[in-house]
A protein has these predicted regions:
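Non-catalytic pre-domain segments flanking phosphatase-related domains
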Residues: 2-130, 136-142, 146, 192-193, ...
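Conserved GTP-binding G-domain of TRAFAC-class P-loop NTPases and closely related GTPase folds
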Residues: 225-226, 232-253, 258-263, 267-314, ...
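Hydrophobic anchor at the beta1->P-loop junction of P-loop NTPases
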Residues: 370
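The conserved Walker
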Residues: 374
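Conserved phosphate-donor/acceptor-positioning beta-strand/loop module used by diverse small-molecule
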Residues: 441-461
Length: 524
């Protein structure tokens, strides 16, 4: 009976009707009784201090402010008005908008127009990247999964920015690349379909991003502007487009309107290399600090002529780490003319008059085959060195197919003209068709090999695509795949392929000083 009583106490699950216990119930109750009535631990003897005390609960440090938590639980009807104004901008009149601009004006401040056009201009700019510089994800993931998934990168960030604005006279600006955002759906390639090519999930990221940025700016609560580049155009860091828009928005047009010496850009993309910090007493193996994903933030600061620091240097006072650039402009300075020691040889007029001779015609009629990756400088070389010698040009970017190139070259040769094949021609199989054409037409075939490093080619391609004065054929920028594809197929050209000679051209900037002002910035 005692065991039955215990069973009733254990089996507290609700039932719809009262049933008498069955043998099955007694079997279960016996099992349960064995567990309940098992041996217990002996009581600790008095004075026994071998038992550890319970662990102390420590309050975890967090960068999430109390106001953020309060705002999250506040009903929408009771939340203050959003002080952030959003606009969109295009790189030119013929392109869609790719730049998101958020202007925040605290309550009680002048209106947007008045704050921008104020007669008292702040000459010092403190510009910051957004992700991994001012904020990071609260979830610990690489990318925020929703608008609320963020926290300050370090708890000192908001107070430091407020001090810059309120006490040190800086204008605080935010520049961020947001390539994962699409402002407007791409039109469908099919005329019969009205559905956009851009996935809906990608379009949904824009309102989430706006909501997150509005919360960040609201907590910061100082007059500021955030610029978010969503395309691979002039706005994307390290390109200067966002900086130029900021200058226009704040009426900073004159050379002395900005104190460049005391202005600064802070961002995590500094080209830092992975390093092993010193071990702790030599006993614990140190963990390597990760390598930066790019050098775009450091390069933007270089392009606009201001100081650069990483978040660790600016907010935490850490010492700078070593950094490298895949493409370093230091290796490609503006050259003086190699044919003269005239003090004015660096001027555009002098360099154009005394052009370096890199190619000479050796026969009345020739077929010249260019070999080199996209952006190696092949077309520029033609215009400056071979066109003046009377060569006609065949280019697949213009004619759109190899067959059309072969047909055009054949017609030029039949008319007695010399021809340049201005294509990449990476491998012997591709070059063989042109060697056979030259033999068939009875003209010598020569090769000019452009030994331009791939990273310089990518730089040249970006310079050409983003600057109309240097893009007479209005070419668009190429994907990285185009450069990697050439590299995978490339075989060094040899005289034994049938060439009369192979002229090697190493890259160095050849152009006017005005052109170098554009070329001599970081574009990738």
């Amino acid at each position: 009976m005692g065991q039955l009583t215990i069973t009733r106490r254990v089996c507290l699950c609700p039932t719809t009707s009262l049933r008498l216990p069955t043998p099955h119930h007694f079997a279960r109750s016996f099992s349960i009784t064995q567990k309940v009535m098992g041996p217990t631990k002996r009581p600790a003897e008095e004075g026994d201090r071998s038992i550890s005390p319970p662990p102390l609960k420590r309050k975890a440090q967090t960068a999430i402010s109390k106001s953020a938590v309060a705002s999250f639980f506040t009903p929408v009807s009771q939340k203050p008005k959003d002080r952030t104004t959003w606009t969109e901008k295009s790189p030119d009149a013929d392109s869609p908008a790719t730049l998101l601009v958020a202007k925040y004006v605290p309550e009680g401040s002048p209106t947007n127009d008045e704050s921008v056009n104020t007669t008292v201009k702040r000459r010092k700019i403190a510009a910051f990247d957004l992700d991994s510089t001012l904020i990071t994800s609260a979830s610990g993931k690489k990318h925020s999964h929703d608008a609320a998934d963020w926290k300050w990168w370090h708890h000192s960030v908001p107070d430091r920015l407020r001090k810059l604005y309120n006490e040190e006279g800086y204008q605080v600006i935010i520049f961020t690349n947001q390539g994962g955002l699409t402002l407007h759906a791409s039109p469908s390639s099919s005329s019969s379909s009205s559905k956009p090519k851009t996935p809906k999930a990608q379009l949904d990221r824009v309102p989430q991003f706006k909501q997150k940025c509005s919360a960040v700016l609201s907590q910061l609560d100082i007059p500021t502007t955030l610029y978010a580049a969503t395309g691979k155009d002039i706005y994307r860091k390290p390109r200067p487009g966002m900086w130029l828009e900021m200058k226009a928005d704040y009426n900073l047009f004159n050379d002395d309107d900005i104190d460049l010496e005391n202005s600064i850009f802070v961002g995590d993309a500094g080209g830092r290399q992975s390093e092993l910090p010193p071990n702790s007493n030599g006993r614990i193996k140190a963990t390597a600090t990760p390598k930066d994903f790019s050098c775009s933030d450091r390069n933007l600061a270089h392009n606009v002529g201001i100081q650069y620091q990483t978040p660790e240097e600016f907010f935490l006072g850490e010492e700078p780490r070593n950094f490298t650039r895949d493409f370093d402009l230091v290796k490609y300075p503006y050259p003086s003319s190699p044919t003269t020691t005239d003090p004015d040889s660096s001027s555009s007029s002098s360099s154009s008059k005394k052009e370096e001779i890199l190619f000479t015609k050796t026969s009345p009629q020739e077929l010249v085959l260019f070999v080199g990756p996209p952006g190696a400088g092949k077309s520029t070389f033609y215009w400056r060195h071979l066109k003046p010698l009377g060569f006609e040009r065949v280019n697949q970017d213009v004619l759109k197919s190899k067959d059309k190139c072969l047909k055009a070259a054949t017609e030029y040769l039949k008319e007695g003209d010399s021809v340049v094949v201005d294509n990449t021609n990476p491998d012997p199989d591709t070059r063989k068709q042109w060697v056979e054409l030259a033999k068939k037409q009875g003209v010598p075939v020569r090769c000019v090999w452009f030994r331009t490093p791939l990273v310089v080619c990518e730089h040249n391609d970006a310079v050409r695509a983003l600057n109309k004065p240097l893009n007479p054929e209005s070419r668009t920028s190429l994907p990285k795949l185009a450069f990697n594809s050439f590299n995978s197929r490339f075989k060094e050209p040899k005289v034994k392929e049938g060439f009369q000679d192979v002229t090697e051209v190493d890259f160095k900037f050849r152009g006017t000083k005005e052109e170098y002002e554009i070329w001599g910035k970081y574009w990738i």
